Amino acid sequence: MAEFEPALKKRLEELWGTPPNLYRALGNHPKLVAAWTEFSKTLRYDTRTPRELRELVILRGAQLMRSEYEWAQHLKMARKAGVSEAQIGELSSWNSSREFNGKEKAALALAEAVTLGKVSDEVQAEALRHFDMHDYVELCIVAAFYAMVGRMLDAMGVQLEPEAREYSPRLSSQ
């Protein structure tokens, strides 16, 4: 894990407090971690789609990629954003669950398609029935960015921080 340049360390602490292991691993490339930080900040705080919906998209991607790190980190954020325990519990079967409305199901179908690498005309059409093009683009970027995050975590062998290891439900139960 890298140590940060002073300016980057200050910025990371402003945004996230103690930088998580993902940022410490990315810190081996200061220019990329700086760009990544600002882009992820924009996705988290400067978007129009509801945070709750974006967190559902992120959690579903984490399930599909079996990314324990991403799942554990975003469970806290999802709960804080208003995702219900029932939705978390039924996320792996969202398409047949009554816990999700039509808009959420359209976003989750899009999240799955983006994460798995192919958005069909049907998935796109259903998403565009619920979202205008601005929000559709946002959701596509969120799903794609967090799919990249999951893949980077795996490729770099980033371990979940000890204080984040006690979470429920476990990804393995999903």
How would you label these PLM feature ranges?
Residues 1-174:
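Hydrophobic alpha-helical segments
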